[in-house]
């Protein structure tokens, strides 16, 4: 994902790629923070937390797409610090269609009796259920006032990222599905987050919808 993000940033007229932080390249994040206004992180959850804290202390905004990232420790650290030095946006999914799917599912959950979520990903994905599915279930529960719907996870070679929300009521069902065919589908959302993270009124926030709607 990092290579795809770098390519997208380089192609954007209003952005400049100033560094690629990667231990395999011998480049540590702390060594390049002075050059950056925004850092995009697609690492592992434990690494992403340390990276985000380092960025915030340096006054650098952060966009996090790391799968399975828990924002609670970051929020606690920010609250303890007491200063709003930089903003953090965490997105379970950067695909615009996926964000719309979650929004539609939350709206439908207000009107349909029951629902279940099926999420399918490549067999190299580390977390199950996916962050997108967990976020969808949470939004649906908040909208309906009920409990989060069950989530079924599938991990198989040949898949990229897919999710279907199936809602049922008396004599009818409703299916809302999103399919990611290529990782390039995430890039418009990543670039949007990079452009908007600095103007967030609260931080950290979870969900691309915070800058999309």
For the regions a language model picked out, list residue spans one by one.
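Conserved NAD(P)H cofactor-binding loop of Rossmann-fold oxidoreductase domains
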Residues: 43
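An anion/phosphate-binding loop that grips the pyrophosphate of nucleotide cofactors and donors
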Residues: 36
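N-terminal Rossmann-like NAD(P) cofactor-binding module of classical short-chain dehydrogenase/reductase
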Residues: 39-40
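Short glycine- and Lys/Arg-enriched binding-loop motifs that mark or flank ligand-binding interfaces
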Residues: 61, 93, 127
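Rossmann-fold NAD(P)-binding glycine/threonine-rich loop
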Residues: 46-53, 57-58, 65-90, 96-99, ...
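C-terminal substrate-binding/catalytic lobe of Rossmann-fold NAD(P)-dependent oxidoreductases
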Residues: 2-33, 46, 112-213
